UniProtKB/Swiss-Prot annotation:
Keywords: Chaperone, Mitochondrion, Phosphoprotein, Transit peptide
Transit peptide residues according to the UniProt entry: 1-24
Subunit and partners: Part of the mitochondrial complex I assembly/MCIA complex that comprises at least the core subunits TMEM126B, NDUFAF1, ECSIT and ACAD9 and complement subunits such as COA1 and TMEM186. Interacts with ECSIT. Interacts with ACAD9. At early stages of complex I assembly, it is found in intermediate subcomplexes that contain different subunits including NDUFB6, NDUFA6, NDUFA9, NDUFS3, NDUFS7, ND1, ND2 and ND3. Interacts with TMEM70 and TMEM242.
Primary residence: mitochondrion
Name by which UniProt lists this protein: Complex I intermediate-associated protein 30, mitochondrial
Post-translational modification Phosphoserine, affected residues: S318
One Gene Ontology term from the biological process aspect of the record: mitochondrial respiratory chain complex I assembly
Amino acid sequence: MALVHKLLRDTYILRKFSKPTSALYPFLGIRFAEYSSSLQKPVASPGKASSQRKTEGDLQGDHQKEVALDITSSEEKPDVSFDKAIRDEAMYHFRHLKDEIVDHWRGPEGHSLHEVLLEQAKVVWQFRGKEDLDKWTVTSDKTIGGRSEVFLKMGKNNQSALLYGTLSSEAPQDGESTRSGYCAMKSRIPRGAFERKMSYDWSQFNTLYLRVRGDGRPWMVNIKEDTDFFQRTNQMYSYFMFTRGGPYWQEVKIPFSKFFFSNRGRIRDVQHELPLDKISSIGFTLADKVDGPFFLEIDFIGVFTDPAHTEEFAYENSPELNPRLFK
């Protein structure tokens, strides 16, 4: 029903604007917009598209010039097959849904249950092309009037992602903000068929594994859980990642038990364990108040099981150890 409503709305917009432009793409489906933009604009006949005018005779002489105008008749409309657009959009999502059902019966992500149970390590994100960069988004304090800038591109030989930019802690001149200076990179929420929100299940692993190369700056690694409650949209679990600098790669291993709970950027007194069975996204934030250029190169981001790590949770919440929190 939602798909039909979206396409009917797209039909109305396309009738109001006979020539699809990039400004309409946010209102149209991706595949529907590509289909509409591929249509050829009808060309007006020479008889209807030409007119004559007389130039200034006193200055340049008495001669006329025919000026061709590209005018499209109001009766001529683009030949749009909305049935085909609806059918293509629906078939695309149904094929995606079929793949999800088949993979579910085979096992998690199409792997057999035996392989999943024996899996000790898994690469979740790697950067080998532009399609891998499209799974991420970058932001900075420029959205609130700051001066920091951040960019994301493929690294050398298209074997890594390079996050770079300039950090500025100068506060915006808006009369309200007193602090500024951050740059961030965040993964997009995975989507299934019919744009359903998906999540990652890392419950069988206990450690985050990264291969990075930085300039010596400290970064904050943020993990968000999948939730449908509006009150939890600003909640996340964080821990620090320290880069060494220099030309060599470093392997960073962070146990999930070390991640602490925060809300709206403030660490909470009552801590909670990271729910590994419903991970929504992961991100990296730089806010060390050191103005100047920075970079962080990422080879891959994965998870693995470390048999030497037996800690379940690093922060105690029992009433016996901290009774003030449980009054």
